């Protein structure tokens, strides 16, 4: 298993799989709790990524709607 950081899309897919598992109600309680905890952590990471992307986009756009130089990406 590599230490490569997963992309936003990969994490979102993992979260969707966890939600689907939990919605079926067919997994044991202990596993459901573990999956719920993983899902909450993924959700938090995804939210941070979205907030960071939003801040970057706000910095890029000038008040008049023109684009500024993108230094950080």
Swiss-Prot record:
Keywords noted in UniProt: Cytoplasm, Exonuclease, Hydrolase, Nuclease
GO BP term, pick one: DNA catabolic process
InterPro entries: Exonuc_VII_S, Exonuc_VII_ssu_sf
Enzymatic reactions: Exonucleolytic cleavage in either 5'- to 3'- or 3'- to 5'-direction to yield nucleoside 5'-phosphates
Annotated signal peptide: none
One term under GO cellular component: cytosol
Enzyme Commission designation: 3.1.11.6
Location relative to the cell: Cytoplasm
One Gene Ontology term of the molecular function aspect: exodeoxyribonuclease VII activity
Pfam families membership: Exonuc_VII_S
EC category name: hydrolase
Family: Belongs to the XseB family.
Alphabetized HAMAP family for the sequence: Exonuc_7_S (MF_00337)
Quaternary context: Heterooligomer composed of large and small subunits.
Function recorded in the entry: Bidirectionally degrades single-stranded DNA into large acid-insoluble oligonucleotides, which are then degraded further into small acid-soluble oligonucleotides.
NCBIfam families in the cross-refs: PRK00977.1-2, xseB
Name of the protein in its database record: Exodeoxyribonuclease 7 small subunit
Protein species of origin: Streptococcus mutans serotype c (strain ATCC 700610 / UA159)
